[in-house]
Amino acid sequence: MEFCSWLKVRSKGGDTVLFHTFSNQEERRNYGGSAFIEIQFCKLPAKTKRKDLAKKINFWQNDSLYIDDVETFFHEYSHIFNCGMYSNLESGVVDLYGVNYYAPNFIDPIIQRLKEEKTAEYEIVIEWLDKAKRYNGFYILGI
């Protein structure tokens, strides 16, 4: 059985694996359990009230990106994902231990910043964000 579907790119002087995908829950559990940040499509309707966006999340989706290197992710991406809405409806830098929602209108500006700054494995994030345009934005779900 293949252990995990890896997304690999050469980044900042070496092979790194910052982002992971899993084809099922068993794969994820075998790899590392639940100690991941999850970047997940928001599949709720566009008319969902803002206060309800954080209440109806289904964690551990197979089309999500998973991050186990929290420190590197924060260092590389916190200044880019600095416009998310927390579950208390406040906004700010990505909360690594909470729910962060990014509305669809934030996707293109985030992609533009990624192209300019070329953060670690930014190509993977851009490809995933292009798919997020089909949905009602996305979440970054902390550990």
Task: Indicate where each model-derived feature is located.
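Acidic (Asp/Glu-rich) sequence patches and key acidic residues
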Residues: M1-E127, K131-Y135, Y139, I143
